[in-house]
A protein has these predicted regions:
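N-terminal intrinsically disordered, cationic/polar leader segments
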Residues: 64, 86-126
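N-terminal helix-cap/turn-to-beta initiation motif at the start of protein domains
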Residues: 34-50
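Positively charged n-region of N-terminal signal peptides that target proteins for export
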Residues: 1-4
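Hydrophobic/aromatic beta-strand elements that line small-molecule binding cavities or substrate pockets
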Residues: 69-71, 75-85, 94, 111-112, ...
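Short helix-loop boundary/capping segments
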Residues: 142-196, 216
């Protein structure tokens, strides 16, 4: 039942902080709470909590003579964002959906990892493939990378930017970067291959916003060709309408498994070489079995250790370091 609902989530793209230590040159240094570093941390941690979410996407301008913009897509639901790791200069936020009509239940969603002054950043290069790009000393100074991961902890995209506080609003915006198709399009259309996105996060009195200025790209010729512009705004408003105890129970039952799955994916990033999925388009054959393993753990049908062994085999089946040309990786 839970996995069937996930397939239908096209619209979902299927805290106050004390002074924290961080590592500088091998030494642990305590930074004052008033430092720019701590102010940035507070902004990132403000994205954790329980939210009522609205996803609003509208194609605004056709950039191809034969294309007609699609109808606006608006959806919503509830989302819990948990801090699952905080090392001072690294913060990991796990999103969990709360779905299912009257009988709602929690379901693991996407994850965002924030690294202060990163040396490298995960970069999507099209056709379900990624590489690690070096970040120059100038670009990393005072900056944070955000790397975003799928429901099965496989990669989606990453970028580097600085938090700003103009007009009293904490906001983060990186340079324009590619990302894979969102699930709302990946499962319903096949006329483009990547999104060239300007991505903004802003903290508001009631929660936070995720704004996007997207250009949908066709890559069939090997060179990007713009199809249409899209504007998106995802609104996260704090709410007390969710049974957080149920969400906590769900996460406690599966968190060891997901920590192991994250470690498997980290091996690719640690290698520093380009890597890809062997699947074209929507990688359901990868993420559905892994989500199924998590459900079996939660239902008491399988241990985390046994499930992780199977997850490693699934990931190995659908990943490669031997990348074919871009046009051969497209569906």
């Amino acid at each position: 039942m839970r996995l069937a609902i996930l397939i239908g989530l096209g619209g979902f793209a299927l805290a106050a902080c004390a002074t924290a230590p961080t590592s500088v040159g091998g030494e642990t240094v305590a930074r004052p709470a008033s430092s720019p570093f701590e102010r940035d941390r507070d902004a990132i941690l403000a994205m954790a909590g329980t939210f009522k979410v609205t996803f609003d996407f509208i194609e605004t301008a056709a950039l191809d003579a034969d294309y007609e913009p699609k109808e606006r897509k608006v959806s919503g639901g509830y989302e819990i964002v948990k801090v699952i790791e905080d090392r001072g200069d690294f913060i990991s936020l796990q999103h969990i959906l709360y779905v299912g009509g009257e009988d709602k239940f929690p379901l693991k969603h996407w994850r965002q990892d924030w690294q202060h002054e990163p040396n490298r950043v995960l970069t999507f290069i099209g056709g379900n493939a990624w590489t690690l790009e070096d970040v120059t000393a100038r670009d990393r100074r005072g900056a944070w990378s955000q790397e975003v991961y799928q429901v099965d902890d496989s990669p989606r995209y990453g970028a580097v930017g600085r938090w700003t506080y103009d007009n009293g609003i904490p906001a983060w915006q990186p340079a324009q970067a590619w990302r894979p198709l969102p699930r709302r399009d990946m499962t319903t259309r096949d006329d483009y291959h990547a999104v060239d996105a300007v991505n903004r996060h802003a903290i508001t009195p009631k929660g936070w916003l995720h704004e996007q200025d997207n250009t949908k790209l066709v890559l069939s010729s090997g060179e990007p060709e713009a199809l249409v512009r899209e504007v998106a705004i995802n609104t996260y408003a704090r709410t007390n309408e969710v049974d957080n105890a149920e969400v906590d129970t769900h996460w406690e039952a599966t968190k060891a498994f997901w920590a192991g799955v994250r470690d498997v994916w980290k091996t690719f990033q640690n290698e520093g070489e380009p890597f890809a999925l062997t699947l074209k388009g929507e990688p359901g054959d990868l993420y559905m079995p892994i989500l199924g393993l998590a459900s079996q753990i939660e239902d008491g049908e399988m241990s985390s250790e046994a499930a992780l062994k199977e997850a490693r085999e699934i990931i190995a089946t659908y990943t490669t370091l031997d990348l074919p040309p871009l046009t051969e990786r497209l569906r």
